[in-house]
Design a protein with these regions (language model features):
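Early extracytoplasmic/domain-onset interaction patches
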Residues: 25-90
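Beta-strand-rich binding/interaction modules
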Residues: 229-230, 542-606
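Short, hydrophobic/aromatic-enriched beta-strand segments in well-ordered soluble domains
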Residues: 74-76, 80, 91-93, 152-166, ...
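Hydrophobic alpha-helical and helix-loop surface patches within well-folded domains
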Residues: 21, 27-42, 54-55, 283, ...
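A surface-exposed beta-strand-loop module
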Residues: 28, 69, 79, 107-178, ...
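Solvent-exposed beta-hairpin/edge-strand motifs
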Residues: 86-129, 183, 221-226, 567-578
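Glycine/proline-rich low-complexity spacer/linker segments in large multi-domain proteins
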Residues: 101-112, 161-216, 237, 306, ...
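Hydrophobic helix-coil surface modules that form long, contiguous segments used
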Residues: 193, 208-388, 417
Length: 623
């Protein structure tokens, strides 16, 4: 694209901004183009020309636990809703993270490195393709096509296989000799969107995923002594399970209490499935971004359900599937159920959108649509915080369809605030401050770029703080300033406009502004776009009789709430709070006044969620 086109585009965009809210955010040129094309709007809603592509997947695979060979076919009907003719279709082969020669940002043991996904046959619209029609580069595969016209559907049939990793468990792989979590297991078409065209980012292990909303039918064949749990609804439970187990599943789906679906005695008796040789498990999921499954021949299964939408009476089932030797997992069903309940009724106060949430005892700390792969933990507090964090991802990214690869903060930041808020609901003794201390330690260093830095450019500590605590705190501070009613109006407007679609960061910022009716650009720019640190201090303290006047200074550039804790000599405390609104005008000082109820011993500035790069100047001691 030549400079002249950029100039015209920028002039056109400046015209749009003249009628936009006071104070605008710095929008990159490639994102400005979405406003010109009418695919997105400056009030946050999708534009009149918004489009996204979709596909129907029919997956049939066999998995052999002994050899770890997964083999099968995938049939795809891909709908091109874009205005472009697609001369090629790009695929993702995520198992190629373990392929020889692939680029990786996470370590993989030599014994797990192999030949990757083997494509033995491919056809397009029932026309056989030879190998010259496709090219594989790491986790990407490009397939030449005759040209898929706008509004046209193209059909792919692919026969493939690969060996699942035994160790080096990066979100998928063998858990133990009789348990496996199997994700990203089929060739899938990459996202083609109005911003980047084809998503050609390689999956290297750190940055996560970006997938279209699709319809899935999956048939998964495993030995007869294994059970399967997966994204979506099991369509043939009555054909596979014994009548006893099938009855317990039905009971769990309609009862608030916990049902022991598979017990230790059931495992001993071996009467869980009807066919003891092999079973084909059939799952269906609609309008989801991915499908994952897990299998085991020795796991217990606890299940419960609850009404997640009081208007319709719709229920969702919650599962904990686990190794009996992992004692912490016996309580995970309670943590998971309470998380789904809290999400539906308190935060984000949106009915849990899927038919089930299954927490599987694995070797990672990872989310998938309707599934979680969580390692066991010794402390109940840690198990609670991990469980609610991963389940919260149901909303972000899965319900909302965000690009995790480029904008990790758009899902991990939400899972972080979700964890902070829900953990104390599950156990009021918990004050969950996950990752805040790490941010305070790195704030202002070379390892602390702005949140809006693309996640693809980050790794290590910079990736972690930009994805988790920094955006989580930003959301928390806005929630505190707006109050729950206005905050929910903004957040629900964003969810309503964009669930099932692909929002970019500016869609979120603009939706929050529009939905809440408050221009928050001053904070978005400071917290998400600018460099700087959070750093407050206690300045002058004036005392006239029992009247205290305290100067609080913002020595940094990031707006943080003011929480002054007054410690009295009898051990009691009083908290004085101001939201980030007190810094809105760019002032560097605010003044707090209070009347002491008793003799003051000391003043301490900063609560557990008030990030501060230097807490040494946050204490004033009475003389």
């Amino acid at each position: 694209m030549k400079f002249g086109h950029y100039l015209c585009l920028s002039l056109a965009f400046s015209g749009i901004l003249k009628c936009y809210s006071q104070g605008t955010l710095p929008v990159p040129v490639n994102l400005q183009a979405t406003y010109i094309k009418g695919t997105r709007t400056t009030n946050g809603a999708p534009g009149k020309n918004y489009w996204q592509n979709r596909a129907d997947y029919n997956i049939k695979v066999n998995f052999d636990p002994k050899s770890r060979l997964l083999s099968g076919t995938v049939a795809i009907d891909y709908v091109n809703n874009s205005p472009d003719t697609l001369k090629e279709v790009d695929f993702k082969l995520y198992p190629n993270l373990y392929k020889k020669g692939s680029i990786r940002s996470m370590p993989v043991l030599p014994e797990d490195i192999g030949d990757g996904v083997q494509i033995s046959q491919m056809s397009i619209n029932q026309q056989h393709q030879n190998e010259s029609q496709w090219a594989i580069d790491g986790t990407n595969m490009t397939v030449k096509t005759p040209g898929v016209l706008p509004k046209q559907t193209v059909h792919f049939d692919i026969t493939y296989s690969y060996i699942l990793n035994k160790t080096s468990h990066i979100r998928t792989g063998q858990v133990d000799s009789g348990a496996f979590f199997i994700a990203y297991f089929f060739p899938r078409i990459a996202v083609y969107d109005d911003i980047d065209g084809w998503n050609q980012q390689h999956y290297t292990g750190v940055q996560e995923f970006y997938n279209d909303f699709c319809h899935f039918n999956a048939e998964i064949t495993v030995p007869g002594n294994y059970e399967v749990w997966a994204t979506g609804n099991l369509k043939n439970a009555g054909e596979i399970y014994s009548s006893t187990i099938a009855g317990r599943i039905a009971e769990a789906a309609k009862n608030d209490g916990v049902t022991d679906v598979i017990t230790g005695q059931d495992l001993k008796d071996g009467n869980i499935t009807q066919n003891k040789v092999a079973n084909t498990w059939k799952f269906e999921a609609d309008s989801v971004t991915d499908l994952a499954f897990a299998i085991s021949n020795h796991y217990l299964w606890k299940a419960s359900s609850l009404v997640v939408d009081p208007k319709s009476g719709r229920r969702s089932r919650v599962d904990a599937v686990f190794n009996a030797n992992h004692k912490d997992y016996f309580a995970v069903i309670n943590y998971a159920r309470k998380t789904v309940e809290t999400m539906s009724y308190q935060f984000p106060k949106w009915p849990y959108p899927y038919p089930h949430e299954t927490v599987f005892d694995g070797l990672d700390q990872m989310e998938y649509p309707m599934m979680v792969n969580d390692n066991p933990l010794e402390k109940a507090e840690d198990a609670i915080e991990l469980t609610d964090h991963e389940i919260f991802h149901t909303m972000f990214p899965f319900y909302m369809g965000t690009n995790e690869t480029k904008y990790a903060w758009m899902d991990e930041g939400w899972a972080t605030i979700g964890e902070w808020l829900i953990s104390s609901v599950i156990d009021p003794k918990i004050t969950d401050t996950f990752a805040i201390e790490g941010y305070e330690g790195s704030a202002g260093t070379e390892n602390d770029p702005p949140i809006m830095t693309l996640s693809t450019l980050l790794e290590g500590g910079a990736y972690e703080t930009n994805s988790y605590p920094k955006p989580g705190l930003g959301y928390l501070y806005i929630k505190d300033m707006l109050g729950d009613t206005l905050f929910n109006k903004g957040l629900h407007y964003y969810i309503t406009q964009w669930h099932g679609k692909h929002p970019m960061p500016f869609d979120f910022f603009n939706c929050m502004n529009t939905g809440s009716g408050v221009n928050l650009n001053w904070f978005w720019k400071s917290w998400f776009f600018d460099n700087g640190i959070p750093d407050q201090s206690i300045g002058k303290v004036s005392i006239v009789q029992k009247q205290y006047t305290v100067s609080i200074f913002n020595n940094g550039t990031k707006a943080v709430p003011v929480d002054l804790v007054v410690f009295y000599s009898d051990g009691s405390t009083e908290n004085i709070h101001k939201s980030i609104a007190c810094w809105k005008d760019g002032n560097k000082k605010v003044t707090l006044s209070f009347t002491a109820k008793k003799r003051v011993q000391q003043l301490v500035l900063g609560g557990p969620f008030d990030a501060d790069a230097n807490r040494a100047d946050n204490i004033w001691v009475a003389k």
